[in-house]
Amino acid sequence: MTSKEFGKILQDKLTSEYGVELNVASNQQIYRSLALICRQMMSENHKKFQSKAIGTGTKQVYYLCMEFLMGRSLKMSLFNLGLDEVAKKALADADINLDSIFEEEPDAGLGNGGLGRLAACYLDGMATTDICGTGYSILYEYGIFKQKIVDGWQQERADNWLPGGQVWLKSHPDQAVEIRFDGEIHENWDNGFHYIQHTNYNSVMAIPSDMYVQGYDGKGVAKLRLWQAKAPDFDMSSFSLGNYNTAMSKNANAELISKVLYPNDNHVEGKILRLRQQYFLSAASIGDIVQNHLSSYATLENLPDKVAIQLNDTHPTLAIPEMMRILLDECGFDWDKAFSICQKVFSYTNHTVMAEALEKWNVDIFKMTLPRIYQIVVEMDRRAREELAKAFPGDQGKIDYMALIGDNQVRMANICAYTANSINGVSKLHSEIIKESVFHDYYLFKPNAFKNVTNGIAYRRWLLASNPGLCKLLDETIGDGYKHDASDLTKLNKYADDKTVLKKLNEIKLTNKKDFASYLAKSTGQVIDPNSIFDCQVKRMHEYKRQHLNALNIAAQYLYLKENPNADFIPKTYIFGAKAAPGYYMAKQMIRMICKLGDLINNDPAVRDKLRVVYLEEYCVSLSEHLMPAAEVSEQISLAGTEASGTGNLKFMLNGAITLGTLDGANVEIADAAGKENELIFGMLTPEVNNLKRVGYHPNAFIMGDDVANSALNFLERGWNGENFHEVTENLRSSDPYMVMADFKDYRRAQADLQKLYADRETWARMSLKNIANSGIFSADRAVLDYARDIWYASPVPMGK
């Protein structure tokens, strides 16, 4: 397609939608028109793709996740459709900058952190590799929240993303699914058949809206189906009798389910709402999957041959008993046959090594909210206990630990582990840890079910669409094969000693840093020096991710520079970006500490030219697309054995940042791929952490003999300008659950090594090159094909050339 032809399509859309000419259209009108053009093209491509899949009997993959962190869609849709250059030219001919149009789109408010971003990357990977994939989630009206930092404190504001994001969604009210909550269950037997009657229930309708993800330069398209909660009908009788509040409350209560991602569950009402959300997602999705399958095959007997359902974390666990409910109550299968089908179609990805993070629901809340599902889980638990008793005779403690219900709680992870045909971790280390600790007993019970698929990222978004300068260098050195196959990046290794290439790499990074500094100044007013080291830690704010370890070192560096103003110190800009869960008080204290430390340092003329701290408010996908190409140091500093994998670390690596991190999660594989000498590794190893926990960890043992640690803690404890951070420091001095103080000294050593290495620009560029060259293994394409081969047993749709 030529730019002229594209310009005509755009003008036709502007005329039909808004009745305006391109030269007078607003940026918002142009954005919406471009989105509609892309949506229509992707919808047509998806119909062809699905038709081919059904016609050839290709296995369908369904990916259930509570969140999909999609970011913006316009830029990547144009890019993957191969229309980015013609769109840019068509708009330039009308004196319009395409980048300014991209800024009109809000980030889709459907996710929070790595879990949701991984799900979004895998939709991209499925589309690109021609795996017939559908994602399922909830159409959150307000998403997670918009973060506002006021006087150092995080404030949560409604993220009203739908007015700008709705254009990507196509609603299908005719495909709504009824979801039933509460009520009573009545069981009857008639001529050997078991009948279930559910009475006095509350209905909620799940209305689907679809958005599409186009595969890169191909014919594959993935669909993301999002469910919106609506009351089944308006209570006109109550309204007519003057009971306005009753009539309206039914609507409001139903629609609460799809208002906000992860409502605060520090109270009973929040817990019930979360449970209702999870069942709503699970039941709507399973109902849709069953209906789709029946429309193609008219039987569920062959469901395992034609369908694979991936549960991404424990949030969609209730899909398992819901599938059982449909097979038993609506389709007349006996228990053994129904459970056999479930065992074959469901697989589960675990995302945490911390047992306390595995979801459990109070039995009374569960039974009241989901009475029929509770009955099914009780029967699953009874049968599981019988089976486990045969596997582990006499070991009642093990059976109780592995049971689906115990200690008055319904255990989501155990439902998954008992039922799923595959249980996978998301990095090699994580997959070993879950076999050794969290799911050790289940590993003994069904060892062949445990697998590993290391996380992958949609690398084209983070490289091809975000870092054109680096792509130009890659095209000139290794050709453009890497755009289709990320493993081609390894060809860059042969340039590791090419001084010209290394010099160009440094120049590209400096240009990207200048671009980011300019973007930051324009969007926030914050001024940073592009010639300083850009040291970045952007991820959820959480104690286990140890942003307070980073902050403690910044405090120590500040004190050092105050005492040694003429010290040889390469200027450094520390960049943070993170949201804290609304009910997570300590994480909010950590944000306040970092922000206040930044205010102090950035306003101190004695140090601000050598040290700066930037907190990126409302960190999101589109902001990260600006940051990743500019980053030089990737802080991945979780306590060894606590991070499952990570995805930010992979994006940083792809763009040439050096990992400053522990050997945790995917950092282990990053160091293996690029060479440990090309990262800055510090801290205890997982066995050392476990041993220290076993003998008893006392943070003061590490603080007492360390003057730097003592000074930094005292400084933060005393505070300044009437502010102090004793709650954070007291936590570090007393319990320190993530062993910040045990790793602090070695972390400082790694930071000192960083300064020395960075001073040798050629050495630093070589380290950067080795990271770029060996990052291809972490592509979502590779990860999806691993899942397809080892877990889903799914083949690509044979689309032909």
What kind of region is each of these model predictions?
Residues M1-K801:
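A conserved ligand/cofactor-binding region detector
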